[in-house]
């Protein structure tokens, strides 16, 4: 058997998330159908993480196992010839059998795009930004700093997934200009993320940026470990899985895989 690693970009607008669901269109489902057409057998695809309905990806990583008789297949070209226009393979490579797209990951990066203008809105950006209006950048920056480090993120986890621990480490949280003058991108890098954790953090930060909560609210919520006390979840459409880091482990992964491959393909990370 051979293990193939994929780096995938997709527009999540018309998908019911990543994970396979009966009678619903998902990214995993489309990938498995395409691979099955090539191999003639059912193949299970394993992703680095589950994105929700409407969430996009520039650096989702997945792997699957196939018989060695398919060693000559050019997987990137073959899959892209079968996949619909809203999902594409940025890279495909043979990796060690020890590599696992989820369990080998050291850290992940997500971006969230905000629309800061109230007076007008570009309709074609509606599936990729949250129209939140003007924000106090100073308060926003202060709020982001409280997320850094190792914390119990129970207050920022939505229910629905069984996990062993709610403790995660945030390595970096920053902001920078987006695709247009009216957009701003929040980028967060962490050891891993709980269910809808990034969207919950963004929802809290926007509330702070609007002046409806103090930056110190983040610290208080982390200490409370109570999801019901935290602000509402940010909409799905602004979120993008930007990349997954596997380190120089010999398992077939390097830093920010999605970002690197997207740049090689001429795709800007802020798209």
UniProtKB/Swiss-Prot annotation:
Pfam families with a match to the protein in the record: PseudoU_synth_1
Enzyme class: isomerase
EC number from the UniProt entry: 5.4.99.12
Residues annotated as catalytic: 52 (nucleophile)
Record-linked InterPro entries: PsdUridine_synth_cat_dom_sf, PsdUridine_synth_TruA, PsdUridine_synth_TruA_a/b_dom, PsdUridine_synth_TruA_C, TruA/RsuA/RluB/E/F_N
Annotated positions binding substrate: 110
A molecular function (GO) term: tRNA pseudouridine(38-40) synthase activity
One GO biological process term: tRNA pseudouridine synthesis
Keywords: Isomerase, tRNA processing
Catalyzed reactions per annotation: uridine(38/39/40) in tRNA = pseudouridine(38/39/40) in tRNA
Signal peptide start and end residues: none
Family indicated by similarity: Belongs to the tRNA pseudouridine synthase TruA family.
Subunit structure: Homodimer.
Function of the molecule: Formation of pseudouridine at positions 38, 39 and 40 in the anticodon stem and loop of transfer RNAs.
Protein name: tRNA pseudouridine synthase A
Name of the gene this protein is made from: truA
